Swiss-Prot record:
Keyword set includes Hydrolase: no
SUPFAM superfamilies: Bifunctional inhibitor/lipid-transfer protein/seed storage 2S albumin
Protein name as annotated: Seed non-specific lipid transfer protein-like
Pfam families referenced in this protein's UniProt entry, alphabetically: Tryp_alpha_amyl
Family according to the record: Belongs to the plant LTP family.
Length: 43
């Protein structure tokens, strides 16, 4: 299972986009991709 800290750190770059209508940061896309990859391989 993924820890809350792992999810938090991977989505940190998305907070402005999700809450303040800020431009989508490249780090957000990277974090989401990382989480997706971890979710597919983490029991």
């Amino acid at each position: 299972a993924l820890s809350c800290g792992t999810v938090n750190s991977n989505l940190a770059a998305c907070i402005g986009y999700l809450t303040q209508n800020a431009p989508l940061a490249r780090g957000c896309c990277t974090g989401v991709t990382n989480l997706n990859n971890m979710a597919x391989t983490t029991p």
